[in-house]
């Protein structure tokens, strides 16, 4: 932003980005046709499309007639060949420069996806667009961002390609970092040097992010991370280690116990520079006065204008805690992207996280949308076919042929399908979205949930969203209980469909804040019963519980810090802490996480909601 006659005006870069956004969203149908034509023309000779008989055709009709809608499992053998060193044009004509890895939080196995220069440049423009909208909504002067960003370990595939998270692939790209640094105004570099981001030790990296953020507190204009969870984890750590951080600032040297990597110590030394007892004293007074740490962000970073991270989907649970930490500082939901590619931009950044919508970028990919039937819970259960009534998961509509980007209907639900420059052709993303409106000819999407069924024992079908509703319903009992003097609250949760015994049953794991871990036995039993009843909104579940085809729901209360152990388990396996999303259901194949959860269990409750005798 630039100053002119006392008013903030947009920089040249932001003006160009806004013009591009308006142009492409206005001409969305033409842009989509051209995007598909470019993808297919560029990749006309690749093996996958030749096998399907596309024969160089580039129109949407021929493409849809010959190329099937697929999942990752369908493309994985082709991707594996590329990773193993097959240099022929298997999925893309352009060279594959790296492999991107998903977080792998649900099944315990990380998906592999192709990364190339097209995705790099699309991501660069995506980030520039994000900055432009943020700068328009929250104009700031030059300063810094307290950015909780973490690189992940990389592996080398059999074919010699680097495999890591998509964000790490971007951060390791000289073109990406140079493009971000080349912005004119405002200049908002991270508080932390890159050595901190790429520290091999997550706890060391987190500690140094906090240390650098406190040392440069007056310059901080924003607090950000890829996901809300990362900011919450960081500020929870601050609650524990603020005295150590103040001691480091007082003596002008990082704790040798906390910061052990030589390159990281060298990188933060110039920021520490010299002992600063005055700053240490001021920080100690502010931290000591916080009490429950409400408003810690404006207390320690008074010039922060906003807090930005993805706050939709599985991140919704952390919004309440993040709002607690942020005080009056606005929460800004990040944009809509995935390991597969960029999708939409949050163009209405003043909207609260609970109502954020994303405007699809028509030239990021070729988009299709599978019509879905929303959950139906008002039908009566049929004793002979309980699964037919009240299914709480989204299913394909009767006429489920995918529709184009500009043909979606406001108010309807869809699953996103993408065709990209990185070798994904009619790829089911697995995301359920609701069309909230249009910006010119381009739809604005509200993220609803992941479509995947996460809890099922018999004929029951419960999704991630259903789990969230059940936990939220029980949390109201916890919050409103007159005996809950120590104000227990749910810090985090996950679930598991346990079929190791007959009948199988749902297990929900809670970590609690407030009071002692073993407090609240009476109210927690009621919470357990309430979750069991809430899942009964799915007629298949309710009928199965009544007939004992599904056993009593089990609530396991975990030791404080248990979910931090889950995070560390994934980081130790090569996942990035910055891209970590708590798995809302842990599959039986994810034995390592189940072991962490079971080892940290301190109390167990079984539902009595269906005990009638």
Curated annotation (Swiss-Prot):
One GO MF term attached to the UniProt entry: acid-amino acid ligase activity
GO cellular component: cytoplasm
Domain of life: Eukaryota
Transmembrane segments: none
Biological process, per Gene Ontology: response to auxin; response to light stimulus
Keywords: Ligase
Enzyme Commission number: 6.3.2.-
Tissue expression remark: Expressed in roots.
InterPro entries: GH3, GH3_C, GH3_M
Induction statement: At very low level by auxin.
Assigned protein family: Belongs to the IAA-amido conjugating enzyme family.
Biological function: May catalyze the synthesis of indole-3-acetic acid (IAA)-amino acid conjugates, providing a mechanism for the plant to cope with the presence of excess auxin.
Name of protein: Probable indole-3-acetic acid-amido synthetase GH3.12
């Amino acid at each position: 932003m630039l100053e002119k006659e006392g008013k903030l005006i947009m920089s040249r870069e932001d003006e160009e980005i806004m013009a591009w956004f308006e142009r492409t969203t206005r001409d969305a149908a033409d842009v989509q046709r051209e995007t598909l034509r470019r993808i297919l023309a560029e990749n006309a000779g690749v093996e996958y499309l030749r096998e399907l008989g596309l024969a160089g055709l580039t129109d949407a009709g021929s493409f849809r007639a010959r190329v099937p809608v697929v999942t990752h499992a369908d493309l994985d053998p082709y991707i594996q060949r590329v990773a193993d060193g097959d240099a022929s044009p298997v999925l893309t004509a352009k060279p594959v420069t790296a492999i991107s890895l998903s977080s792998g939080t649900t099944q315990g196995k990380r998906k592999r996806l192709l990364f190339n220069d097209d995705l790099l440049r699309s991501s660069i423009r995506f980030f520039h667009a994000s900055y432009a909208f943020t700068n328009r909504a929250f104009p700031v002067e030059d300063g810094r961002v307290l950015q909780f960003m973490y690189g992940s370990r990389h592996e080398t595939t059999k074919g010699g390609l680097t495999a890591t998270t998509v964000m790490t692939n971007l951060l390791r790209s000289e073109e990406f970092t140079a493009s971000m640094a080349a912005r004119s105004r405002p200049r908002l570099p991270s508080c932390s040097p890159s050595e901190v981001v790429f520290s091999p030790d997550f706890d060391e990296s987190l500690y140094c992010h906090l240390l650098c953020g406190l040392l440069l507190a007056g310059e901080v204009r924003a607090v950000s991370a890829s996901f809300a969870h990362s900011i919450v984890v960081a500020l929870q750590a601050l609650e524990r280690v603020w005295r150590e951080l103040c001691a480091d600032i007082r003596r002008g040297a990082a704790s040798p116990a906390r910061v052990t990597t030589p390159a990281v110590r060298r990188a933060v030394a110039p920021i520490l520079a010299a002992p600063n007892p005055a700053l240490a004293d001021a920080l100690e007074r502010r931290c000591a006065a916080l009490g429950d740490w409400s408003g810690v962000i404006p207390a320690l970073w008074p010039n922060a204008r906003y807090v930005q991270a993805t706050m939709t989907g599985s991140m919704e649970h952390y919004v309440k805690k993040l709002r607690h930490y942020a005080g009056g500082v606005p929460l800004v939901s990040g944009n809509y992207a995935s390991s597969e590619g960029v999708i939409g931009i949050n163009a209405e950044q003043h909207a609260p996280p609970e109502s954020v919508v994303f405007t699809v970028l028509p030239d990021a990919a070729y988009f299709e949308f599978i019509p879905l039937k929303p959950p139906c819970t008002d039908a009566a259960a049929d004793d002979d076919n309980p699964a037919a009534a009240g299914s709480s998961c989204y299913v394909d509509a009767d006429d489920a042929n995918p529709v184009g980007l500009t043909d979606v209907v406001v108010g309807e639900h869809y699953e996103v399908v993408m065709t990209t420059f990185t070798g994904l052709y009619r790829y089911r993303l697995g995301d359920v979205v609701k069309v909230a409106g249009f910006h010119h000819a381009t739809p604005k999407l509200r993220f609803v949930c992941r479509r995947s069924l996460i809890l099922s024992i018999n004929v029951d079908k419960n999704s991630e969203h259903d789990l969230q509703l059940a936990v939220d319903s029980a949390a109201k009992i916890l919050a409103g209980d007159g005996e809950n003097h120590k104000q227990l609250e749910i810090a985090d949760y996950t679930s598991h469909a346990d079929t190791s015994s007959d009948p199988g049953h749902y297990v929900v794991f809670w970590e609690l804040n407030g009071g002692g871990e073993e407090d609240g036995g009476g109210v927690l039993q009621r919470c357990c019963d309430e979750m069991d009843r809430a899942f009964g909104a799915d007629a298949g579940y309710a009928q199965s519980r009544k007939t004992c085809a599904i056993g009593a729901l089990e609530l396991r209360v975990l030791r404080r810090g248990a979910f931090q152990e889950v995070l560390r388990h994934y980081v130790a396996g090569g996942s990035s802490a910055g891209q970590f999303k708590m798995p809302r259901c842990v599959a039986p194949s994810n034995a390592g996480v189940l072991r962490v959860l079971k080892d940290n269990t301190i109390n167990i409750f079984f539902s009595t909601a269906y005990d009638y005798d």
